[in-house]
Amino acid sequence: MCLYARMEETAEIKISITIYMSIRQFRSIVKEVERYLGHNDTTDADELYRAGKHYLGSKFRGVYPRDKLPKLKNDQCMIINLDTSKQAGSHWIAIYCAGNSYVVYDSFGRKIGSILPSLTFDGSGKKIITSPDYDAEQKRYETNCGMQSLGWLIFVYEYGIHKALKI
């Protein structure tokens, strides 16, 4: 094996280890949120708001249905439900404002256009970014999307957005 191939292989191993460690850290944060809320099941807006303020303080704007989204400033975040304010609620996703971009996290790993094709925040023209992996952290039978979303936001503030995009 030539030196270049070994260097490439070593770099791939380091990246794999980094991703593995990030996922472990993320899961640990989600478990902490579950302990704080006292369960690992479906969450309502009040529970998520209380936990979001507890962990993230003023950086956490709140919990909203998709038709009532506020403006976010740089380094602020929120959790939104895919349903409108007139519906019961179906699935929570997280939004983080990074400069001129909104970063969207979906625990099912779907492309944002497929779950929320008309997502608009404030007419600011900010770019919408999702994780390029489209990998799911939540299994179909699990109902903890709110905790996963909050866990991802906590991870963003603890480890940085670049690491969070690898989850």
Predicted segments, located by residue:
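Cysteine protease catalytic domains with a Cys-His-Asp triad
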Residues: 2, 11, 17-93, 98-102
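Contiguous terminal or domain-adjacent regions
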Residues: 152-167
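Cysteine protease-like catalytic core of ubiquitin/ubiquitin-like
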Residues: 74-156
